[in-house]
Structure formats: C-alpha cells, structure tokens
C-alpha cells in the first residue's frame, strides 16, 4: 500500500478491501498530457520524429509547388524556442503561455527545358521561418490562454469506417426494414448506399440527391455484365428433350416451393411432389443421396434472368441482353433460334434477391460517361459538365489523398468489417472497397450477417487535445498554402527567400480561434481539485463534428454494455446533456487509434495471473471476462466450477466453466469514474442519487480547515496527488529551508552534475481560482525531514495530509426537529459557525483601466472631486487601496478621474484657471468601488503600466518587493550550491598530499579540513594534489559550479528585466490595476449543503448549541437531518457511512485516552496494543519509532480514518464489529435528549459522523435587493437579475393574485410608479423626501412603446384626455 510515504506514516487508513490490486492506476490526467506531447513531440530530436502530430501536418501540406512547377517549397524540420513568459507570469499578466514555433523551409528553384519539359535544380535556399506561437500545456494538463486556465475536453465521435444499419421500419408504412450502408472518412465526402421501399439500391454522396448504385459502379469502370457477374453466380441450363437440365445445389434449392413435381434429370424419378416446400434438411438429404441435376419444364424457367448477352454469332444481332427477364414469349423465340444452353443468374427470390439486377434495369445511365455526368450534376447542380471535369471531380471525391482520408483507424475498421487486407497506409477508397460494401449490404437484405451497433464503443472513438489541435493547425496551414502558391507565382522567385513567401497569420489565427472560441475549449472548473481532474477526464459527444443536444436520441445517451471499465455509467450531468457528456473510468486509457481501453488480468487454464492486458471494446468482444470479486484460492485458481462472466458480442452475463474464462477485471472500481469512486458504499446507493453525489462533490467549496473523511474509499490520496493540488517532491532529499511561501529541498538522489542539486518549490498563497475559490498551499514538512520522490510535502486547497478533503466530518442525528428539516432542509448547530467548521474564503478580482480618451487621459489618483477624506482613508498616495484594508460595499478601491467634455470658457475664466490651476470642475469621478454584497480584506494589488509610462510609487514598491523575493531565492540557491560544492570539494581534498596551494601554503603539506578552514572557500580551488584523475574531477566540478552560478545570475537578471519592462496592455490603455478582495463566508441559512450520496439540502436554521439534541455524555449533535430523506431516495450508503463514522470517532477517542495516559506514565505499550486491535498486524505501524507513533496517535485521536473501496468495502458484519470495538451498541443507535427540555426522546436515534460538503451555491451570491437602479432604455422598466442590479419581476400570475384580492391600489402602484411610469416614479421619490405619502399614477412608458409599434405598422393612434360625454375635438374627428 501507499502508506509508507511521508504523509502515510502520519495518518494510516484502515483498509477494508479484500481484493489485491494488481494494476497500477494510470495517472489521472494522462489522457491530456500524453495526447498533447504526441502532437508537439518537443522531446524528440527534429530529425527523428515519427510521422504524426505536428510533423504529419507539415508533411501533408508541404511540399508546395507554384502553378507552373518552376519552384517548390519543402518542409525540413521544426523546433520550439523557449516561451517568453513562464506559467505564473502569464497568469498574472493575462498572457497566453505559448512557445514560438520555428520551421526550417527549403525553397528549390528549377530550370525548365522548354523543349523536353525536363526540370533541373537551379537554386536551393534554406531558412528558418517563424510560424506563430503554439500554446503549451502546463504540468497539470491545462492551457493558460489570456491569463485564464482552460481545458480542452476530449470529444467522442463516430469512428471512420463503414457502418451498416436499417431504419427500424420507420420510413415505410408497411414497417419494412430498409437497409443502408455509410462509409465515413476522417475527412472527405460521405458515401451512403441504401435500399428504397421497392428494393432498388441507391447511392448518395454527401447526403445529396440519390443516384442508382449501378451508376456509381459504371463510374468506377464496370459495365452491365461485369456488375451482374460481380454480384451473382451464373448457372448453365441445358436443353434436354423433356425440358431443361439444371445442376442441383442444396443451398440454392432450400425453401423452394414446387408448382410441378421435381424430377431427377438423370433417372426421371419424382423427388418431390408438386405443391410442397423443399426444407433445408430435405434438400441436404437429396444431395447426400447423390442427386446431381433436376429436370425443369419451360414454364419453370420463366421469371429467371439472363446472365449474359445472347448474340447471333453470324450477324452480331443481340437477341437478349444480360439481366433481361425470361418471359414465355422470349423463351419461345430463343427455342426457335435453337439455343441449347442458357446462362441464367442465380436469383431464387428466397436466398438471393434480384436487387442489383432490378437497379440495373431501372438505371437510365448505360455508359460510364452518362454516369459521370449524372454524378457531376448531383454534386454541382447548374454547372455544365465536360467529360474531363466530371472525371476529375469523381476522382477527387474518394480517390485523392488531398481531399479524402479514411485515416489509419478507418482503414483498420473497414478491413475488419469487410474482410479485406489493404495496408493501413492506404487511406483512400478503392474500387474493391466500394463493391465489398455493396455486396455486404445486399447480403444483409438477403438475411446474411448483422447490422452494426453505432453506440458500441468499437464504433466510437475519442479525439483528444493533440488530435483536435492537429486538425485545427492543418486548416490554418491549408489557408496559408493558397496564399503561398499565389505569391510564388507573382514574385521574382530567384531573389526571394522562404521568409518572404510565408505569412504565418492564418495558422496562428486558427490556433487562437480554437483555444479562444471552440466549443471544446472550456474555462476550467477549478472549484476544487476533484472538479479540475474530472474536467480534464471528460468526454463530450457535442462540439464541432459531433452531435447536437436537440438531435441526440435516447440510444446515444444510454449506457451501453461496452462502457464497462471504459466510461462511467454514473457520472453524467442531469438535464439536456445527460449521457452526451461522460467521464472516463478510473483505469481506462485511450489507445493510439483513439479507442478507449480497459485493463484485465489474463487467466491461463483457470488460474488468474498478474499479467495485465489492456483491451479495447472490439477486442474484448471475443473473450469471456470474469468480475474482480470472484473468489480465488491462494494459488489464484477459481474456487467455483462455474463462473459469472460477460461474454459474446452482446456482453451478456452468463455462467461458464472456469477453464473457459479468458480474463478477469483488475479492480472492482474500474467501471466507475474518479468522482464516483470517492463515494463510500456506492453499492448501497440508488444510481440516480449516486449521479447527484458524484456531480455535487465537484461543487464543494474548499474550506478554511480541510479535514479528510473518516470514511473514505482509498482514492483520496490519488486524486490529491494527480490533480496537482498537493505538491509532491520531485527528487528524494532533505528539507533545507522552509517558510509559508516556499520549500527548499537539497536533493540526495538523482544528482546530475549538470543540474542544480537544489529544488525550490514555490507555494501558492491566497490565489484566486477560476471560480473565485481560494487556492492556498501550506507546507507539511519541517527542516531536516527526509522525503522520498513522490512524497507529498505541501497541502493545497481541499487536501489534508495529502488526501482529498472536500468537506468536514460532523456529528449527525437523523430525526425530525420542529419542522426545521422538512423537505430536505438542514438544521445546524451554532458551534459549526462559531468554530468556522464550514467557513470558506472566496477571492474576488476587480480591475480598473485608465484609458487615453479623446478628451485627454484618465488618471489614477487620490485627488477625486467631491469625495470626503473619510472615503479616501484606505488609499495610498497613488490612489490605490492598501493591502490588508477592510472594505465594504461602496468603498473606493482605486481612485480614478475621467475628463469631462469642455464647456466653452470666457477669457476671465481662462485667466483664473491659469492663475489658480483650478481643474476639479472638468473631471468626473469614475473610481472603482466595491460592488454591493461584497465585504472583505484586500489581499493583493497588481499594477500594470504601459511601455514608456512613468510608474507611480505603488507600482515601484510592488516591483521592489518582487525583486527582493527573487534575490532571496537566488541567494538561497547560491548558498545551498556553495555548501554542496564546497562540501564535495573538501571531501575530495581531505587527507591528500598538497603539491601547491594558495598564498601561504607550504608545498607538500597534507591537506586536512583544519588547513582548509584557514583559507576563504573561494581559494580552495587553488589547492592541487599529485593525482591527475582527482584534479580532472575537481576541474570538471569547478566548471560546472561556475556555469551554475552564471545560470542563476542570468535567470535572476532575466526575471528582473521582465519586471522592469512595461506590460503589454490592450490598445488605448495606459495603466491597469487589479485588486483582489478576500471574502470570508461563514455558513448561514440559505446555503446549500450535501453529503456524498446525493443527499442535498439547504440550511434552514442555525440553533444555539444548548438547544441541539445531545447524547448521554453531553455531546451535542452538529447537524440534524430528516430520516424521511432516506427511504424514498434509496441512498442507504449515508446511513452505513454514519454508523462507520461513529465507530471511527469512538476508536479515535480511545486512542486519545491512551495518549493522555502516556503523558502521565511515559509508557507506549498500551498505545501499540490499542493500534494493534484496530489495524491488526500493519507493517507501517510496526515500523514507526516512538516519536512517529505519538504523532500518529495524535492525528488519529479525532477519528480513525478507514477506506472502504467501492464494490469491495466493509460489510454489515464489519461495521458491527467496528462499533463493538469502539464500545458502542451494534445497532448504531443511541439515546438522545432534547436540548431545550432535557427530556429523553421517545426512541433511540441513529447518531454518527457523516461527511458533509458546503456547495458553491451560496446565499450571498444569490440574494439581492434593489430600491433605485438601472432601467431598460426602450420600455423604461427596471432591468432584471442580480448582475444588472435589477428589480423583482411582477409577472402575470402575481397580477392575478392581486386582482383576486381586489387590491386595486397596490396593483396600480406595481404597474405604474414602481415600474415604468417615468414621471410618476420621480414624483413619488420627491413626495417621500417631503414626508408626504400621496401620489398620482401617470401613463406607463409601455403604452407609448405600444403606440409607436402600431404607428410603425401604419396605424395612427392618438391619446385624448377628454371627460366622458364630452365630444372629442374637431381635428380628431376628421
């Protein structure tokens, strides 16, 4: 187990799993990293790159020739230059983390001989060309684009290849199945071949108008006879005197209904009477008895079809064409001509249908030319076809590698489905492929073979980042190619260099567009480490080239048997995207063809081996696979004779003998995703609730104090490590220095003389995540600790001792409490608020820009007109708020003034202005203020200045601080380097004979440490010993030391130079200030909370501690949940978790008591015994020394953490045993007393510890109030929504309610002065100010809008204020 790590020794989880895990779980973000590495191939030397990724893109577009073939631009190699800014700098400055791509191109100019047209090389020029920036992936599998972290989600799409399907009888009213085949390339035109209701076969190209499939075959170069001979066998009927002799074939005659008797042609015996049907069995028996041929009469030939043209050999006249149907009349004519043999098609209408023959006779095109013209008209309607253009167009549709690409996957799939053997480098269609598709389709119509299941994971593949990016870059390069061709033809090619031909903008724009606005490039969900990991492992069926929500049916969204171990059946969003967005299962990985694979243990002759094999869905279909929880004996043999397996193409569950099992699952959790694998007792929860549980864990807000769950699943450590939230040591070493912002480790292994022996880990302090949660890392180590490679040395957000910790363990009682937990409401104790159990920190970012306006530049300053000194108290002299200031809504964060439009001045004013410099009147206050509902502490301020703009005092102060920090890093690294190098040098020189040395050293004296101490360290290099090998080693060491020193200094200077250089700001912006406010959010009524089992609710009340129900020992419950939330939801896992959590806490208490006893008696034996009772013979605990044991005991005293893996966890008996061990009743229920009266409740209550999360749906972000605010320009009604500071909508139903109450005045107020009666609302305000409460409603603005709308339709409407009975004025009457 992973317990032997640094953090694993501080807290040991008791493991309840029974199944030994053979396979290592792959790194959880491998999907992203491996795919992008394969695309960039940065690590490969430029010459030795395989033809994939970026290399393949360049190879496919280059070489580019000009239109006259007189010159050619070739691709040689590409390489990346180091990125301009590192990841952190990009995040802070709002830049994209990318590396410049440098491509070496070779321009070859030819001389063309005008007579022969032969080319000879005239000139070759090579040059490096800059081809835009390519975004790089960070260590955690994300991209930093414009300063924000983004994730490229992998896409599931239909694999290229051929698919056979039918319409399920929906098209035709008779319910007849219409079969269709579709050839889908990776890029290029789709080819559909389909039956219609009359059984004629049609082809469609790119979903256009259909053409008979025979026209397609004509276009491929076949004629009518060849088409028929390709699809049908030929049978020779011979004339004998009683009729026709036909060879007997059991397969052909099975199901044959006779009209006359069937007679053996050789003996004349009747083998089957008239009116009977020849069964398969009877036909086979006849063949076995030696029946060679049958005798058929003339009328039985009628209705058959000719296989060849019948031609008069003398005159060349055609009597009948191939495919023609034989009628009585035509048969009579043929008999008269004296034909003794008739070649007929093997069509019996039972086993073989006449579909291709019927299509051929229905086809109007008779020649290849007609067919090509027809296809051309379909593809390009309205253009007159010529034979050339039609031929080229057809050729380019399927046979041109520029336009059509099946891809290696498509070719492999096609070969498998059609039993072909084309190499996977042949990526266009061939004539054989198209004919094989038509044959297979006709075979399906004849009842041979099966249609494909398009939701089978063998028919869907994953496009990951690398591939998506490759396609995007190819699009960019193809756009560029056109421009290059034109430019090559228009410039003087002899003088031009490759650089002049290339404009890299289209390629860079394609990349930028993909990262900025593609549906698959998403703003990373960074609420907590789990949400990051899940986002990177997501598979989406949406996006370009994928499905759309509206069109996706039920089948695509449903769970398929092949999802087992590949895609999680549980984790998917609720709502319109359900089933379209999935998550990769824990052990799954994507293979080189893009198919999802899952690992299995190989079974040899009934014995399970430790050999792990990854299988894709197609490969798995051939094997029988047993589940992971099948019982095995000590040697790995199955204990049962019959084993439950998934077998066959449909993956049905069957019982088969042990020796027929091929594979076995590696782990029970391999079928669920990471989020679902974190739910303990998942097997006891209903699937719908488990889905909510996995989705809600992703919304858990990191709390101020993270606490790992008592009841975990053993996955917590893996998630914390792979997500990058917790920091792992890169090399084994010793902690040298440590503070809250960084850890310095002196490496003791993997020492490379060319690299620094020091690792510095910078910790993130109070950084804002994409979702405004707080990212804060804190060290777990102290100076002198030894850590191994991969050990966790610092916790991040939502991690505790290197384990994922999304919530807190709280004491729960399941009971109703005064109706406050009605409908899933949650009742909390005041202790939770007082002790900050569910308090979280959120960091809001506000920014302000000072622009250069037409009227003059805006200015960031403290000098703001008409603002009191009180309002400026938090600002420094530059007008920017101090770090640490407490601010609330409406406070100024950054003072800013904007010039107002000048009103013309009189000369006197000008004079006064010149004398007194009075300038306050022509600027307005546009300061950045804290928005409503925000209150917190300033944690960080960043100031950005444009190049050439003077920095203010604040910017300089920030810069100085940053430089000091960098200098400290440099000095520390230098000090450790010195210590390392001089330590090694002293070891080498110690006890050597000195040949020479620094000034004052006597020759041939022994060099000892004491001698060395007399000289400054820098002079130690001057000592020399008579050993050449030693001196060479010292020289190499010195060289390396000088280089390291130089490198350190250079890195420091580069960073300082970047700091002092101006920032790249958007056009027109002179200065930008970003202010970060940390908001502390305590839990309060209205906040949403949830457990891990889909048990969610809203906090309804926070009750004083003394009123909460309490146990016999006086402990008060922290949280009270409604027991009615369990039975109907069927998530019993929460109850089991509660019981087990209760046992964990009970055992923790016991350990705490033994530690208290140790402090009095100084005897550790009781502690070791208690731990042995709980953990059994645990190796880790045995290996701990006394100090480590006490630290472990202290960590366990709150509760003993346990791991109960999904589908292999603690059973009911285990829970009861744990409860007894902790000294509790095995029922898990306790006597509880009412906190308000002190009375005992009527019955015992389930009490225990449950792990609760606080979700990112906080009432502070949702609740909102408005008095006066912005109004809509057209309707003059208040805007809606919190973001717009809008009002509350009083809708149709609310109006009905007031009407029902007869509240006329309230209603009038709602519809007029509180909404869009502009004059009225102003008057109301004035009246209120005067203390008067009368008002009059006017005309709502909506009425004017209606009038304007009617006028725009040509209906004039006027409003006349006339009293009843008074005639309207004359002009109105006209």
From Swiss-Prot:
Similarity remark: Belongs to the RNA polymerase beta chain family.
Keyword entries, A-Z: DNA-directed RNA polymerase, Nucleotidyltransferase, Transcription, Transferase
Subunit description: The RNAP catalytic core consists of 2 alpha, 1 beta, 1 beta' and 1 omega subunit. When a sigma factor is associated with the core the holoenzyme is formed, which can initiate transcription.
Stored Pfam families: RNA_pol_Rpb2_1, RNA_pol_Rpb2_2, RNA_pol_Rpb2_3, RNA_pol_Rpb2_45, RNA_pol_Rpb2_6, RNA_pol_Rpb2_7
Species this protein is from: Rhodopseudomonas palustris (strain BisB5)
Protein name: DNA-directed RNA polymerase subunit beta
Gene Ontology terms: biological process: DNA-templated transcription
SUPFAM superfamilies: beta and beta-prime subunits of DNA dependent RNA-polymerase (SSF64484)
């Amino acid at each position: 187990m992973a317990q032997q790590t640094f953090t694993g020794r501080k807290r040991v989880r008791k493991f309840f799993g029974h199944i030994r895990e053979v396979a290592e779980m792959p790194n959880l973000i491998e999907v992203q990293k491996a795919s992008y590495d394969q695309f960039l191939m940065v690590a490969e030397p430029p010459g030795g790159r395989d033809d994939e990724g970026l290399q393949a893109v360049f190879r496919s577009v280059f070489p580019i020739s000009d239109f006259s073939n007189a010159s050619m631009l070739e691709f040689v190699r590409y390489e990346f230059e180091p990125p301009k800014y590192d990841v952190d700098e990009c995040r802070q400055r709002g830049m994209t983390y990318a590396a410049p791509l440098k491509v070496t191109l070779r321009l070859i100019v030819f001389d063309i001989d005008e007579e022969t047209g032969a080319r000879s090389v005239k000139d070759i020029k090579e040059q490096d060309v800059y081809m835009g920036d390519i975004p790089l992936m960070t260590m955690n599998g994300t991209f930093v684009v414009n300063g924000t972290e983004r994730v490229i989600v992998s896409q599931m799409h239909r694999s290229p290849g051929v698919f056979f399907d039918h319409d399920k009888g929906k098209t035709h009213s008779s319910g007849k199945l219409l079969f269709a085949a579709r050839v889908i390339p990776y890029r290029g035109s789709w080819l559909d071949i389909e039956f219609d209701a009359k059984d004629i076969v049609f082809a469609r190209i790119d979903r256009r108008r259909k053409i008979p499939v025979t026209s397609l075959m004509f276009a491929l170069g076949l004629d009518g006879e060849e088409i028929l001979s390709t699809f049908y066998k030929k049978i020779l009927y011979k004339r004998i005197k009683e009729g026709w002799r036909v060879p007997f074939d059991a397969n052909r005659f099975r199901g044959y209904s006779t009209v006359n008797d069937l007679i053996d042609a050789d003996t004349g015996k009747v083998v089957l009477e008239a009116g009977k049907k020849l069964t398969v069995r009877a036909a086979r028996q006849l063949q076995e008895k030696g029946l060679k041929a049958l005798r058929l009469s003339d009328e039985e030939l009628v209705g058959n079809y000719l296989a060849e043209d019948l031609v008069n050999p003398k005159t060349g006249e055609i009597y009948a064409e191939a495919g023609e149907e034989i009628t009585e009349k035509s048969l009579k004519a043929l008999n008269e001509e004296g034909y003794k043999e008739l070649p007929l098609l093997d069509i019996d209408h039972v086993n073989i249908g006449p579909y291709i023959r019927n299509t051929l006779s229905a086809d109007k095109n008779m020649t290849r030319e007609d067919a090509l013209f027809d296809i051309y008209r379909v593809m390009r309607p309205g253009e007159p076809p010529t034979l050339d253009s039609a031929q080229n167009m057809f050729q380019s549709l399927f046979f041109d590698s520029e336009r059509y690409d099946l891809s290696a996957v498509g070719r492999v799939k096609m070969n498998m489905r059609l039993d072909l053997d084309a190499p996977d480098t042949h990526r266009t269609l061939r004539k054989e492929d198209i004919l094989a598709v038509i044959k297979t389709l006709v075979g399906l119509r004849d009842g041979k073979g099966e249609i494909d299941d398009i939701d089978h994971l063998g028919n869907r593949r994953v496009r990951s980042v690398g591939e998506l990016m490759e396609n995007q870059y190819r699009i960019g390069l193809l756009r560029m190619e056109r421009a290059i061709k034109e430019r090559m033809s228009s410039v003087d090619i002899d003088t031009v260099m490759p650089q002049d031909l290339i404009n890299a903008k289209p390629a860079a724009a394609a990349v930028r567009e993909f990262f900025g606005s593609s549906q698959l490039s998403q703003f990373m969900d960074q609420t907590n480490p789990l949400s990051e990991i899940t986002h990177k492992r997501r598979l989406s069926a949406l996006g370009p080239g994928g499905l759309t929500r509206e069109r996706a049916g039920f089948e695509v969204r449903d769970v398929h048997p092949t999802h087992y171990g590949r895609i999680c059946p549980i984790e998917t969003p609720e709502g319109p995207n359900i089933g379209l967005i999935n998550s990769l299962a824990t052990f799954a990985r994507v293979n080189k063809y893009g198919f999802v694979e899952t690992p299995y243990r190989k079974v040899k002759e009934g014995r399970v081996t430790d050999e792990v094999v990854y299988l894709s869905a197609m490969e798995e279909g051939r094997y029988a696979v047993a589940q992971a929880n099948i019982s095995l004996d000590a040697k790995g043999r199955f204990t049962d004779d019959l084993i439950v397996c998934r077998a066959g193409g449909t993956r049905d569950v069957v019982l088969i003998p042990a020796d027929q099992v091929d594979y076995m699952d590696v782990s029970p959790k391999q079928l669920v995703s990471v989020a679902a694998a974190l739910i303990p007792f998942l097997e006891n929860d209903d699937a719908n609730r488990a889905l909510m549980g996995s989705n809600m864990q992703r919304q858990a807000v990191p709390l101020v104090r993270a606490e790992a769950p008592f009841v975990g699943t053993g996955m917590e450590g893996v998630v914390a490590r792979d997500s990058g939230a917790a920091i792992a040591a890169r090399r084994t070493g010793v902690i040298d220095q440590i503070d809250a912002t960084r850890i310095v480790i002196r490496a003791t292994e993997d020492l490379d003389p060319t690299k620094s022996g020091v690792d510095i880990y910078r910790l993130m302090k109070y950084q804002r995540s994409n979702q405004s949660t707080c990212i804060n890392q804190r060290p777990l180590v102290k100076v002198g600790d030894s850590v191994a490679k991969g050990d966790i040395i610092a916790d991040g957000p939502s991690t505790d001792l290197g384990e994922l910790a999304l919530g807190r363990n709280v004491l729960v009682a399941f009971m109703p409490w005064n109706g406050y937990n009605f409908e899933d409401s949650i009742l909390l104790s005041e202790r939770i608020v007082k002790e900050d159990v569910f308090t979280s920190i959120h960091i809001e970012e506000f920014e302000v820009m000072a622009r250069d306006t037409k009227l003059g530049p805006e200015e960031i300053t403290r000098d703001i007109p008409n603002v009191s000194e009180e309002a400026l108290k938090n600002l420094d002299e530059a007008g920017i708020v101090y770090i640490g200031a407490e601010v609330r809504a409406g406070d100024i964060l950054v003072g800013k003034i904007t010039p107002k439009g000048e009103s013309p001045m009189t000369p006197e004013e000008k004079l006064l202005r010149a004398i007194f410099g009075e300038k306050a009147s022509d600027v307005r206050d546009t300061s950045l203020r804290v928005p409503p509902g925000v209150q917190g502490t300033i944690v960080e301020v960043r100031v950005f200045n444009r190049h050439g703009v003077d920095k203010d005092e604040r910017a300089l102060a920030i810069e100085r601080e940053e430089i000091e920090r960098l200098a400290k890093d440099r000095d520390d690294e230098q000090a450790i380097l010195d210590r390392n190098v001089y330590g090694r040098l002293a070891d080498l020189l110690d006890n050597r004979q000195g040949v020479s040395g620094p000034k004052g050293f006597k020759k041939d004296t022994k060099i000892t440490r004491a001698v060395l101490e007399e000289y400054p360290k820098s002079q130690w290099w001057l000592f020399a010993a008579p050993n050449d090998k030693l001196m060479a080693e010292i020289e190499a060491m010195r060289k390396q030391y000088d280089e390291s020193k130089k490198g350190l200094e250079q890195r420091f200077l580069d960073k300082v130079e970047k700091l002092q250089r101006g920032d790249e700001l958007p056009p027109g912006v002179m200065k930008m200030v970003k202010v970060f406010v940390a908001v502390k959010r305590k839990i309060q009524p209205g906040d949403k909370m949830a457990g891990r089992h889909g048990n969610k609710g809203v906090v309804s009340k926070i009750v004083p501690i003394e009123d909460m129900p309490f146990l016999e020992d006086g402990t008060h419950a922290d949280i009270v949940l409604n027991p009615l939330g369990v039975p109907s939801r069927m998530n019993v896992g929460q109850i089991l978790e509660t019981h087990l959590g209760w046992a964990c806490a009970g055992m923790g208490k016991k350990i705490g008591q033994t530690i208290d006893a140790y402090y009095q008696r100084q005897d550790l034996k009781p502690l070791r015994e208690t731990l042995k009772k709980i953990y059994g013979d645990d190796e880790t605990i045995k290996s701990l020394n006394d100090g480590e044991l006490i630290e472990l005991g202290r960590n366990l005293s709150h509760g003993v953490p346990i791991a109960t893996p999904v589908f292999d966890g603690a059973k009911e008996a285990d829970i009861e045993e744990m409860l007894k061990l902790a000294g509790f009743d095995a029922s898990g229920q306790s006597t509880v007393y009412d906190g308000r009266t002190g009375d005992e409740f009527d019955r015992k209550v389930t009490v225990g510890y449950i792990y609760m999360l606080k979700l990112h749906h906080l009432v502070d972000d949702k609740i909102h109030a408005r008095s006066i605010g912005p109004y809509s320009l057209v309707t003059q009604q208040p805007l809606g929504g919190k973001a717009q500071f809008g009002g509350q909508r009083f809708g149709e139903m609310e109006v009905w309610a007031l009407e029902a109450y007869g509240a006329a005045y309230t209603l009038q107020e709602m519809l007029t002065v509180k909404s869009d009666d502009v004059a009225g609302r102003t008057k109301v305000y004035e009246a209120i100010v005067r203390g008067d409460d009368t008002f009059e409603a006017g005309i709502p603005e909506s009425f004017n809008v209606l009038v304007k709308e009617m006028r725009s339709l040509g209906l004039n409407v006027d409003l006349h204020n006339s009293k009843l009975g008074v005639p309207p004025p004359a002009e109105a009457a006209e």
